[in-house]
Each structure stands twice: as structure tokens, then as C-alpha cells.
């Protein structure tokens, strides 16, 4: 089975926008960043948006915002980029994995349900579950 890592759709317009920034005086933190954040707010009807350099950073910030800390548990898929687990470790939490559905390579709903029932009996529910979608 080949699991696709990503399905990028990079247009000529995207490439031109990147080249424009690379040729400007701002490689980082230039006017394109707040413009992007504002457009994201408008698109999502959110009051605020913060652009970060990677999904790793975004997941870490999300865990902090949700109060993940030492003693907490985060569950994710074993078929993922390491950031899905590392974000918990950065916060001092424990990582555990939920089995996948072999037909989809995604987190199995049945495995998640069974694991939740067992965790509830033990009084050790996860604070965060990060599913991974390909």
C-alpha cells in the first residue's frame, strides 16, 4: 500500500506570489503575513489568526492553548508525521496511539471507541485526540 504524503495543488499564481516575497525586502514578517492572517480571519469568520512557520508549530500552539501539560495524555494515529506526537512531548504530556483502519490507513473509529471506553474505566481519558487525514 502506498500512503500519499501530500497532495499539493501549487498554481502559477502561488509561485508568482512566493517569488514576489523572495524579491522584496522582507523574507519574514513582511506585509504579506498580516495580509494573509486578515484574509484567513475573513474566510473563517474568526476574530484572530496567527500565521506560523509549520504545522509542528501550529500543533504545539494548539496544545498550549488547550492547556496540555505534564500528566495529560494525547492520542494520535501511528501513521503520521512526528509533529502529531511531538507537540504533546513539548508540553510534557504522554503520547499514545490509536490503531488504524487497514483499509484507509486512518484512525479507526472502532479502535478509538474501544480505547475511550477502556480509558474511561481507568479514569485516564486523553485531554486531546489528534486524528490525521491523508
Predicted segments, located by residue:
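Active-site phosphate-binding strand-loop segment of PLP-dependent enzymes
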Residues: 103-134
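Conserved coil-to-alpha-helix start sites within the AMP-binding
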Residues: 80-85
Amino acid at each position: 500500500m502506498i500512503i500519499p504524503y501530500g497532495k499539493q495543488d501549487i498554481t502559477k499564481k502561488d509561485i508568482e506570489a512566493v517569488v514576489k516575497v523572495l524579491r522584496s525586502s522582507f523574507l519574514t514578517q513582511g506585509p504579506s503575513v498580516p495580509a494573509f492572517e486578515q484574509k484567513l480571519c475573513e474566510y473563517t469568520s474568526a476574530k484572530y489568526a496567527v500565521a506560523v512557520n509549520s504545522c509542528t508549530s501550529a500543533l504545539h500552539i494548539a496544545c498550549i492553548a488547550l492547556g496540555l501539560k505534564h500528566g495529560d495524555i494525547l492520542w494520535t494515529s501511528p501513521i503520521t508525521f512526528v509533529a502529531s506526537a511531538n507537540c504533546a512531548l513539548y508540553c510534557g504530556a504522554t503520547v499514545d496511539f490509536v490503531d488504524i483502519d487497514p483499509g484507509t490507513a486512518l484512525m479507526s473509529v472502532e479502535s478509538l471507541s474501544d480505547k475511550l471506553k477502556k480509558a474511561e474505566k481507568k479514569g485516564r481519558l486523553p485531554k486531546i485526540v489528534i486524528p490525521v487525514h491523508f
